[in-house]
């Protein structure tokens, strides 16, 4: 029961050596060759890779053709390349987009592969997803939410394959995730942005005379509360937390120190990966007064996260970086529904707007508070409110005991998360957490 055939279809691209084919009129009759190898794999041991090219949570159209040049590096590595269509953040003329339909469509594609595994090339237990930005986010969601019951009604709605011919449940879990700059964990994305970046900005919507500068400070403070309740741990099992500081907003504590060390390690790696001569390393960092180079360990320290952000990672989005005050960000469309293309979704910002008094600022509009509160109560066509759909699109919901989804999904065992450390689209804490 596909909502749209333009998207809910897929293409499977297979190395030729995995097939024995004979021409039959205008088509070919093909059978799997299970003895031939490509890069050490056979047609039944080859990993399956699925690109999630959905930047900004956009749609991914199903393929209608292909170019070998674009696929050669995958096929020559022995991989099975599966390009599945999926709906994106925007509603279509005759279908609903937004959360959770994009990930639901990808899950349906994974289930299709497993249902037909006997007749298809590839190892059904070695499915890997990869993507950038919103595609990195949806890759992370797929990796964290395997077999989550929250998706059951949505999968049934589009007629996805739920059981095999023997009546066994079909899994939509994946083996691994490669996520570049994942724009995710949207329930706290706004507060993370203001804590990591916004609190150091003094222009635009963060200029001192604006009501949004006060909102920025309140959002940054809310992030500290979240982190202290989240109770993340470092590699040694130590709980990470934030503490009040004499300057800045909660820029002290073990969580802050951990973030600072991540930045320092990144620069240390950069120097050692790109220079062999110690004098060249010293020369590179000498232009930054906030960086100290240790020539014996070939490592760096920085004075503060604030100095790094001011120099390298400026806030490039307004306050309400993801849930825009005027519902103009891509993420507002992600949590729209069939009645409204774009809706507010940030419950923390809503609580702040409805509890704090910004009336002393001449540019404040009190209608924001009621608009946020109203939007959060909207439901989608399956009668789920925004918070449920946000949980479905939040990898952390499945990964930490802070959330109710912990240990209620099949989480991918293999992860690689990368980011441009200076990019201003999301807080560095998104990938770090």
Q: Predicted segment positions?
A:
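Short beta-strand element of the alpha/beta-hydrolase
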Residues: 10-15, 23-57, 72, 128, ...
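Alpha/beta-hydrolase active-site loop
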Residues: 96-119
């Amino acid at each position: 029961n596909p909502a749209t055939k333009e998207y809910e279809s897929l293409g499977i691209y297979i190395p030729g050596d995995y097939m024995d084919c004979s021409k039959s009129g205008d088509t070919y009759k093909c059978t799997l060759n299970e003895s031939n190898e490509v890069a050490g794999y056979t047609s039944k041991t080859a990993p399956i890779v699925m690109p999630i090219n959905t930047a900004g949570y956009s749609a991914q159209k199903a393929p209608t053709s292909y170019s070998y040049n674009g696929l050669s590096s995958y096929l020559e590595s022995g991989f099975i390349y599966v390009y599945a269509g999926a709906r994106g953040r925007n509603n279509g003329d005759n279908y609903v987009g937004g959360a959770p339909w994009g990930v639901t469509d990808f899950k349906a594609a994974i289930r299709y592969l497993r249902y037909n595994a006997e007749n298809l090339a590839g190892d059904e237990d070695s499915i890997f997803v990869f993507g950038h930005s919103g595609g990195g986010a949806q890759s992370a969601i797929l990796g964290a939410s395997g077999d989550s019951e929250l998706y059951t009604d949505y999968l049934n709605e589009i007629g996805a394959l739920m059981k095999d011919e023997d009546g066994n449940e079909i899994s939509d879990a994946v083996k691994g995730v490669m996520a570049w700059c994942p724009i995710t964990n949207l329930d706290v994305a706004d507060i993370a942005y203001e804590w990591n970046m916004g609190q150091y900005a003094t222009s635009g919507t963060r200029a001192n005379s604006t009501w949004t500068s006060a909102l920025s400070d309140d959002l940054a403070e809310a992030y500290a509360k979240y982190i202290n309740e989240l109770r993340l741990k470092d590699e040694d099992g130590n709980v990470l937390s934030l503490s009040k500081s004499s300057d800045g907003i909660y820029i002290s504590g073990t969580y802050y120190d951990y973030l600072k060390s991540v930045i320092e390690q990144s620069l240390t790696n950069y120097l050692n990966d790109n220079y062999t001569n110690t004098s060249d390393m010293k020369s590179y960092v000498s232009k930054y007064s906030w960086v100290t180079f240790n020539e014996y360990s070939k490592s760096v320290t920085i004075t503060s996260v604030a100095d790094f952000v001011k120099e390298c990672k400026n806030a490039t989005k307004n306050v309400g970086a993801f849930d825009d005050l005027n519902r103009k960000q891509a993420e507002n469309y992600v949590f729209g529904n069939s009645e409204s293309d774009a809706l507010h979704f940030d419950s923390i910002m809503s609580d702040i707007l409805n509890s704090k008094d910004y009336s002393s600022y001449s540019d404040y509009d009190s209608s924001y508070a009621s608009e946020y509160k109203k939007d959060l109560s909207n439901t989608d066509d399956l009668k789920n409110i925004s918070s449920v759909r946000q949980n479905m699109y939040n990898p952390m919901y499945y990964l930490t005991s802070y959330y109710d989804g912990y240990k209620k999904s099949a989480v991918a065992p293999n992860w690689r998360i990368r980011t441009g450390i200076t990019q201003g689209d999301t807080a560095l804490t998104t990938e770090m957490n």
